[in-house]
């Protein structure tokens, strides 16, 4: 009998009959067994956060992972929502090497949007889908301690950029995350750290997800983005990248802008022992389940060697 498949190009199950749906579920069983009890850190961002149908799909997928025995941890971004809030205030966003320049007023907006709006929307959707989500920032339980990021110019190492209240992670204490996992909750984390004087720092969500995956000894780090994965200059998907290949892509300018911190966070996690790191297309319905519960080669896998 021909085996039913669901691919990134054809993720819709509406045309699949009951028997084939059962077969698809059976194909997922080995992965459910393999990853039972394992931590999956998911960076949630891009269009998947702004399209209502994709928002609902994401929440359902996270709940499903929890119900079958995995431990999903969500780290979310919120760039479009921050940009919209700043525009309403008449402030124009400015980025250097993929990082948002964050003055004091912008930091207040970032904190309000991420922790007060975006995070609560995600928590509500997961709870509505049958999960038990709890929102956290870096302040909660001393989760993320940070300091001002010193950004060195990628073309001139002698030059530094002052990008304001953008943070560099000093340490992560995962105690509160582990406690929530043990009680069957799903942590939803806003990428805001706190400094020695209790000041807030805006930290790139991809970087937070990578560091958290390392500290939690996660089985997988999955980064949802607005592209099929990492693309070469011809627009072709690169399905597998090593550290050496990534260095070459940095050098020739293939990887730039917002993809820079994403790749850096992914590579850091891979080098630090996270078994599997993937950058996938969050615009595809149920993309996360396709990655975790099927054998489809999907997106870009990042390897340390």
Curated annotation (Swiss-Prot):
Q: Which GO terms describe its cellular component?
A: cytoplasm
Cellular compartment(s) = Cytoplasm
InterPro entries linked: AceGlu_kinase-like_sf, AcgluKinase_fam, ArgB, Asp/Glu/Uridylate_kinase, Glu/AcGlu_kinase, NAGK-C
Which residues make up the annotated site Transition state stabilizer?
43, 262
Molecular functions per Gene Ontology? acetylglutamate kinase activity; ATP binding
Its top-level enzyme class, in one word, is transferase
> At the top level of its lineage, which domain of life is listed?
Bacteria
Q: Which GO terms describe its biological process?
A: arginine biosynthetic process via ornithine; L-arginine biosynthetic process
Q: Which family does it belong to?
A: Belongs to the acetylglutamate kinase family. ArgB subfamily.
Annotated function = Catalyzes the ATP-dependent phosphorylation of N-acetyl-L-glutamate.
> What name appears for this protein in its UniProt entry?
Acetylglutamate kinase
Source species of the chain: Polaromonas sp. (strain JS666 / ATCC BAA-500)
């Amino acid at each position: 009998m021909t085996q039913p498949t669901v691919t990134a190009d054809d993720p819709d199950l509406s045309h699949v009959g009951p028997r084939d749906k059962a077969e698809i579920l059976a194909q997922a069983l080995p992965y459910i067994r393999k990853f039972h009890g394992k931590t999956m850190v998911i960076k949630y961002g891009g269009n998947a956060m702004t399209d209502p149908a994709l928002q609902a799909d994401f929440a359902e997928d996270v709940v499903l992972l929890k119900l079958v025995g995995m431990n999903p941890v969500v780290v979310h971004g919120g760039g479009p929502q921050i940009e919209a809030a700043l525009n309403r205030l008449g402030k124009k966003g400015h980025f250097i090497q993929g990082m948002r320049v964050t003055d004091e007023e912008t930091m207040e907006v970032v904190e309000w949007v991420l922790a007060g709006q975006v995070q609560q929307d995600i928590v509500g959707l997961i709870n509505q889908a049958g999960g038990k989500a709890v929102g956290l920032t870096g302040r909660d339980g001393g989760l993320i301690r940070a300091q001002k990021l010193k950004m060195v110019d990628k073309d001139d190492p002698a030059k530094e950029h002052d990008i304001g209240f953008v943070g560099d992670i000093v340490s992560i204490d995962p105690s509160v995350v582990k406690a929530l996992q043990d009680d069957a909750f799903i942590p939803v984390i806003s990428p805001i750290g706190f400094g020695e004087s209790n000041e807030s720092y805006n930290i790139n969500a991809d970087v937070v997800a990578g560091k958290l995956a390392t500290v939690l000894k996660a089985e997988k780090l999955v980064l949802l983005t607005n592209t099929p994965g990492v693309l070469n200059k011809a627009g072709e998907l690169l399905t597998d990248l090593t550290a050496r290949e990534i260095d070459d892509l940095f050098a020739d300018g293939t990887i730039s802008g917002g993809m820079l911190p994403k790749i850096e966070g992914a590579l850091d996690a891979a080098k630090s022992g996270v078994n599997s790191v993937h950058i996938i297309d969050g615009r595809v319905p149920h993309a996360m389940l396709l990655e975790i519960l099927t054998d489809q080669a999907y997106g870009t896998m990042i390897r340390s060697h």
